[in-house]
Design a protein with these regions (language model features):
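Short linear functional motifs in flexible/disordered or boundary regions
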Residues: 18, 48-51, 68, 126, ...
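Conserved AdoMet/S-adenosylmethionine-binding subsite of the radical SAM
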Residues: 77-165
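Conserved Radical SAM active-site core
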Residues: 4-11, 23-26, 34-113
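Short Cys/His-rich Zn2+-coordinating modules
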Residues: 13, 17-21
Length: 165
């Protein structure tokens, strides 16, 4: 049975992206290879508790919500994350994955909404973006940028213009 290291699970109201206002279960996985200067979840870098896929499916069922957001840290840093995403979809949940875009998203179950948080230059991790991820995103997925400055804004704008051409 596959296991994942989990920092926390909790029910919340989605505050950003296209699901704003939805009640969701958050499964925050432990660990992240990035160290963004503005990170607000540094507590998820270490520690956590090992949980099986079955245990996490029970948490989802007991939450009584239909939307599950898998986040981190960087959830894709754990190999079993892909299994968790598919298991949640198979169980009938609407699933989103919040990821940095520094790791490959191509193998994520296509039923999952991939929310890719590209790292801007002033994040301190801008060189870690795996821009090939943009080639596999669909209208079901989303891009996110944390803008720290005008420079970051211009970088994001230029990237989107280049990709749209």
């Amino acid at each position: 049975m596959s296991r994942l290291k989990v920092t926390e699970t909790f029910v919340s109201i989605q505050g950003e992206a296209d699901a704003v206002g939805w009640t969701k279960l958050v499964i925050r996985l432990t660990g992240c290879p990035l160290r963004c200067v503005y990170c607000d979840t540094q507590y998820s870098f270490y520690g956590g508790e090992w949980r099986t896929l079955d245990e996490l499916l029970v948490v989802a069922r007991e939450s009584s919500v239909r939307h599950v957001c898998v986040t981190g840290g960087e959830p894709l840093a754990q190999k079993a994350c892909l299994e968790l995403l598919t298991a949640l979809c198979d169980a009938g949940y609407s699933v989103s994955l919040e990821t940095s875009g520094a790791l490959d998203v191509a193998r994520v179950d296509p039923r999952v909404s991939r929310v890719v948080d590209l790292k801007t230059p002033e994040s301190g991790e801008g060189k870690r973006n795996m821009l090939e991820n943009l080639d596999v995103l669909t209208s079901h997925d989303q891009l996110k940028f944390v803008l720290c400055s005008r420079t970051d804004y211009e970088w994001a704008r230029d990237l989107l213009r280049e990709r749209a051409a």
